[in-house]
UniProtKB/Swiss-Prot annotation:
Modified residues (Phosphoserine): S645
Pfam families reported in the protein's UniProt record: Utp12, WD40
Family statement drawn from the similarity comment of this UniProt entry: Belongs to the WD repeat PWP2 family.
Record protein name field: Periodic tryptophan protein 2 homolog
InterPro entries: G-protein_beta_WD-40_rep, PWP2, Quino_amine_DH_bsu, SSU_processome_Utp12, WD40/YVTN_repeat-like_dom_sf, WD40_repeat_CS, WD40_repeat_dom_sf, WD40_rpt
Keyword Phosphoprotein: yes
Keyword flag Phosphoprotein: yes
Length: 854
């Protein structure tokens, strides 16, 4: 199997902290998710996440007006400049101080960044005008504020900008010195000035403060100021105008104003409050157009798209991201992350959806094509401990610590069956037989396994024998054997349909944390507390091999660790394992920042994937900074929330003894942990449920250059030349040896349909797996339905016997072909239904007209 997996997308986390940014076309929105940036296309209903990572959680992002450059800045001021279209990093830069705000100028030539009390304006990298060796060139620095700057707003002509600060003032600056212009301070607010904006004609400035006050400033002649500015006029006779407060407005809300956004073209002001309320006002009349409460927590950021129709709202506490169309009063996007950590995940049988369960008791269904949450189930009242699909994939089973096992219909999105035990127990794991008729759940209280009938909902049997909490359950492929692992250091294989109740336990050196059956059902892999993976022959009850993965998990230190990263493997274990589709490899993850892929036959580590480089999480850094260690411990763990300026931020709502959730320590640094890992049914991707969300890793066929038996005379040009000369088989083999996606597609589509059977019949089997992978991709992307089906039929006809004998080796390719056929079937059936309805409508119209004429 291929192992060139790379980061593909991050779902499950919609918004973490920072600011939201619309693209200039107004159809896509950029959202910071931890130390990454996700892009949600609201028009095409798709999403993706940039592959680069900041050192820590992102605090600010900015997009150039041409949508070519993206700046992302983390909490410590480290900046990444990337090409937005190519998704590639261009430059790393360190501002050496936390950034309060960063904004591109409307003409795209500059960007302004606030560093404490200081503002720096930098030239935007541009290779067309002034070629510079340095990516960032400092243009000017601006001072004048006496406290941290919180926002920057540019004028439409990019000549001026407004900065607002915690010193209760806003200041007006010019990018370049202008004759007759003097930087001025706009004073009068009684609290932090949150934002300042220019009107469309730039003759009016609006400033909004944290206490809910809106000041309207007008550019007035100096003589109207009277005697107050006579002394200043004598000192500087070049000043002829001054900014004066013309109007004062108040929002009169019993909460703090958190953020504001202004759309100059339509004169719309949008404000968000700490109570979860946001309002839309028309300026300069200060007419309230709309007011709505969307959440019970703070609104942290607001932004308006280029047309002024859509308003994006972000709340970091609940992980909410909303896009509201205020004219139609409807949601364009409404997504929310899990409130607590992910605990489990499960792929659907077609690989189109991933279901996640979390400690908040919610189950979310995520669409892999769009990256959005389709539905959320909230019936569980405690943490979700396990998820499992039936064979058909339309029924989902979940277990929870609330003592219930629930069956969900994923067509109607409802809970149609609930299974409970005779006594109150907490279920820690779940398994469903391949037929979908029997569901089993393990208990961590009574150490028993409960078995129910899905059709009747009745408890069939209780399997007893374990002497510790049952940690994992798994059925084999035939459904006759059930494997159970427990903390009592044993694995038991239950033949649930036999009359004999004798079960011989398999001894494990340490507590069992997870187990999984091989796809052929003859082998079981067990992960234990000592970091080992043991493989057992189920029929003989003998251990066949062992992999010690503790050293592979080592790396990363907690902020209070006294051990080095190399010696930090004592508490690192595998908590989730999964076989590949062909059964040749096993994927394992646990209490570490790594996901390990092992070859079963040799027991060798093939590849190790690092889940995150976010140093805001514990267990990521290899080296700790001794300067951050104090007598009270690490600075990273010291609670500074009591020093906040607002009363609602200083209130201590913690509960003594709470280690997780909202009532735990006010300043928490979560640890990077993978709670679950699973391959997709096709084997072309795998998903990991981590602290930062649901991470998807897939094979990059479009960018992968993996030549097979490459010769000097095999090039794209010679390959296409051979195809043009009619040597279709030779050109196809050459394209597969090059393994370039575009070349293979060009040759594939150039072969006449009459020659398909001949080409497939003579195709060497060594290229069959690679070609089937390309065939499934072409069928899902291009509209040549009959052409693709002819290829698939020929492959299965002439190589069917070989595929049957090597079914485990080609399991992922066959699953991908089946998935492509389902996509083609849905596409064709929808088109046929539409045509049928249109023809029926036209015939009815014709009959009606004939009846009227008669």
């Amino acid at each position: 199997m291929k192992t060139e997996f790379g980061f593909s997308n991050l779902v499950g986390t919609i918004f973490s902290k920072g600011n939201l940014v619309f693209t200039p076309d107004g159809f896509s929105i950029l959202s910071p998710v931890g130390n990454r940036v996700s892009v949600y296309n609201l028009k095409d209903n798709t999403s993706y996440t940039f592959p680069f990572e900041n050192h820590k959680n992102i605090s600010h992002i900015a997009l150039s007006p041409t949508s070519t450059l993206l700046l992302s800045v983390d909490e410590e001021g480290r900046c990444i400049l990337c090409n937005f279209l190519r998704r590639s990093v261009l430059h790393y830069f360190n501002f050496k101080s936390p950034v309060g705000a960063i904004e591109f100028s409307p003409n795209g030539k500059f960007f302004a960044v606030s560093l404490g009390k200081l503002i720096q304006v930098w030239r935007t990298p541009n290779s067309l005008e002034e070629r510079e060796f340095a990516p960032f060139v400092l243009h000017r620095e601006y001072t004048g504020h006496f406290d941290d700057i919180v926002s920057i707003s540019w004028s439409a002509d990019s000549r001026f900008f407004i900065s607002t600060s915690k010193d209760l003032t806003a200041r007006l600056h010019s990018v370049d010195p202008i004759e007759g212009f003097h930087p001025c301070a706009l004073t009068g607010h009684k609290n932090t000035v949150v934002s300042g904006f220019f009107s469309k004609d730039q003759q009016t400035i609006y400033t909004v403060s944290k206490d809910g006050a809106l000041f309207v400033w007008k550019y007035s002649p100096l003589f109207q100021a009277g005697e107050v500015i006579d002394e200043e006029a004598e000192e500087n006779k070049t000043r002829t105008h001054i900014w004066l407060i013309k109007e004062r407005h108040y929002f009169n809300q019993n909460s703090k104003l958190r953020c504001a956004a202004f759309h100059p073209t339509s004169n719309l002001l949008v404000v968000g409050f700490s109570s979860g309320l946001f309002g839309i006002y028309e300026l300069p009349s200060f007419t309230m157009l709309y007011q709505l409460s969307i959440t019970q927590s703070n609104i942290d950021t607001l932004t308006v798209n280029s047309t002024g129709d859509w308003i994006a709202i972000g709340s970091s506490k609940l992980g909410q991201l909303l896009v509201w169309e205020w004219q139609s009063e409807s949601y364009v996007l409404k997504q929310q992350s899990h409130y607590d950590a992910l605990s489990t995940l499960q792929y659907s049988s077609d690989g189109q959806r991933i279901i996640t369960g979390a400690d908040d008791g919610k189950i979310k269904v995520w669409d892999m094509n769009s990256g959005f949450c389709i539905v959320t189930f909230t019936q569980h009242t405690s943490a979700v401990s396990g998820l499992c699909f039936s064979k058909r994939g339309n029924v989902l089973f979940s277990s929870s610590l609330d003592g219930s096992v629930r069956a969900w219909d994923l067509i109607r999105y409802r809970n149609f069956r609930t299974f409970t035990a005779p006594s109150r127990v907490q279920f820690s794991c779940i398994a469903v037989d391949p037929s979908g008729e029997i569901v089993c759940a393990g208990s961590q209280d009574s150490f028993e396994i409960f078995m129910w009938s899905v059709q009747t909902g009745q408890l069939l049997e209780t399997l007893a024998g374990h002497e510790g909490p049952v940690s994992s359950l798994s059925f084999n492929s035939s459904g006759s054997l059930l494997a159970s692992g427990s903390w009592d250091k044993t694995v038991r294989i239950w033949d649930i349909f036999s009359r004999s109740g004798i079960v011989e336990p398999l001894p494990i050196p340490s507590d069992v944390l997870s187990l999984a059956f091989h796809p052929d059902g003859k082998e079981v892999c067990v992960a234990s507390l000592d970091g080992q993976l043991t493989f057992w022959n189920v029929q003989e009850g003998k251990q066949t091999s062992l992999i010690d993965g503790r050293k592979d998990l080592s790396g990363g230190r907690r902020f209070d660790d006294a051990r080095t990263a190399e010696n930090s493997s004592l508490n690192k274990t595998f908590t989730s394992i999964c076989y590949s589709a062909d059964g040749s490899c096993v994927l394992s993850a646990g209490t570490s920042k790594y996901v390990c892929l092992y070859d079963i036959i040799t027991g060798v580590l093939i590849k190790k994937f690092q889940l995150s480089k976010n140093e805001s999480l514990q267990g990521v850094q290899e080296m700790l900074n001794s300067r951050k260690m104090t007598e009270a411990g690490s600075i990273e763990l010291i609670d500074t929330q009591g020093e906040e300026s607002d009363l609602e931020d200083r209130i201590d709502r913690t509960l003594p003894g709470a280690r997780r959730g909202d009532l735990s320590a006010r300043k928490t640094r979560p640890e990077i942990i993978c709670h679950g890992v699973q391959f997709s049914p096709s084997g072309g991707a795998f998903a990991a449920a981590t602290t930062e969300g649901l991470m998807i890793y897939s094979l990059y066929n479009d960018f992968l250059f993996d030549p097979i038996n490459l010769d000097m005379d095999i090039t794209p040009s010679t390959t296409l030349t051979m195809c043009a000369e009619g040597e279709f088989l030779i050109s196809l083999v050459m394209a597969l040896r090059l393994n370039e996606y575009k070349v293979v597609q060009k040759v594939y589509e150039s072969i006449p349909i009459t020659d398909v059977e001949h080409v497939v019949q003579e195709l060497p089997v060594s290229y069959l797996a690679n070609f089937m992978g390309y065939l499934s991709s072409f069928a899902a992307e291009t509209p040549h339905i009959e052409f693709h089906l002819r290829w698939m039929k020929s492959v299965l006809t002439y190589h069917g016997e070989y595929l049957r004998r090597k079914n485990f080796e080609f399991a992922s390719q066959l699953t991908s072909l089946q998935k492509s056929i389902v996509v083609l079937s849905k596409r064709l059936s929808q088109l046929s239904s539409n045509n049928e309805f249109q023809l029926s409508f036209l015939l009815d119209k014709m009959h009606l007209r004939l009846e009227n004429t008669a």
